[in-house]
A protein has these predicted regions:
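Rossmann-like adenosine-cofactor binding region
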Residues: 78-153
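Hydrophobic anchor at the start of a short beta-strand
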Residues: 3, 64, 84
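Cationic, amphipathic, low-complexity segments that mediate targeting or membrane/lipid association
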Residues: 170-205
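Conserved Rossmann-like nucleotide-cofactor binding loop
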Residues: 49, 72, 129
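NAD(P)-binding Rossmann-fold cofactor-contacting core
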Residues: 60-80
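Glycine-rich adenosine-cofactor-binding loop
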Residues: 37-57
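Active-site capping/gating segments
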Residues: 9-15, 26, 143-171
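Glycine/serine-rich phosphate-binding loop and adjoining beta1-alpha1 elements at the start
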Residues: 1-37, 148
């Protein structure tokens, strides 16, 4: 039996990144007492969601910087016009940010980092459990943190359009998953047949 987790298909993950980014922006608008235009943003983690979020923040007029662990990820962010720093510079960059968006489910926003934040700084943690923020320390320090675990379902609840993850999209994604499995099994049978006969056709692979 072949088991396929269609929720891990890349096109579905990318589709979820857009409403998650839009939901994060909505939270930033609601939770800050100023316009996002002219404010500074730090995006921690530059995967699918980080890459969907950063250009949208920049389009709103935010001074957007990226913090990423891997040098090739930072190079990609720089190629796309963003200033990017390693995790070792997180505390320094975070202290200068008005809004911090975290997508890394590893404790990066530690008590040490949180202590460096101005009182008006907003942290929006988009990471899955256990999150990337020391929530206990944030509570003690009075740091404003929103752990947005409910996105993108929360986005749907607030009536922000999410056509990319509609029932129709899921239906098509399941069909693609089934087609992919069938094609893989066909290639495997052809390979076994070619091994037995010693005849390999380029059309079969």
């Amino acid at each position: 039996m072949t088991v396929t987790d269609y929720l891990r298909r890349e096109e579905l993950c990318l589709a979820h990144a857009v409403p998650t980014a839009e939901g994060a922006i909505r939270i930033a608008i609601e939770e800050t007492a100023r316009t996002l235009h002219g404010a500074s943003a730090l995006v921690v983690g530059y995967g699918r969601i980080g890459m969907a979020l950063a250009p949208r923040l920049r389009a709103l007029g935010m001074q957007t910087k990226i913090c990423a662990r891997r040098c090739e990820t930072r190079a990609l962010a720089q190629m796309q016009g963003f200033s990017a720093v390693p995790v070792s510079a997180l505390a320094q960059r975070a202290a200068a940010a008005d809004v911090i968006f975290n997508r890394v489910p590893v404790l990066l926003l530690s008590e040490t980092v949180l202590k460096a934040l101005p009182p008006e700084t907003l942290v929006i943690d988009l990471a899955s459990r256990p999150g990337g923020t020391d929530f206990d320390a944030a509570k003690r320090l009075g740091t404003r943190v929103v752990w947005a675990l409910a996105l993108p379902p929360e986005v749907r609840r607030c009536h922000i359009p999410e056509k990319a993850v509609s029932a129709e999209f899921h239906r098509k994604n399941v069909e693609k998953s089934v087609e992919s499995v069938l094609n893989s099994e066909k290639r495997l049978r052809n390979c076994e047949k070619a091994t037995k006969t010693g005849i390999i056709s380029s059309k079969e692979f």
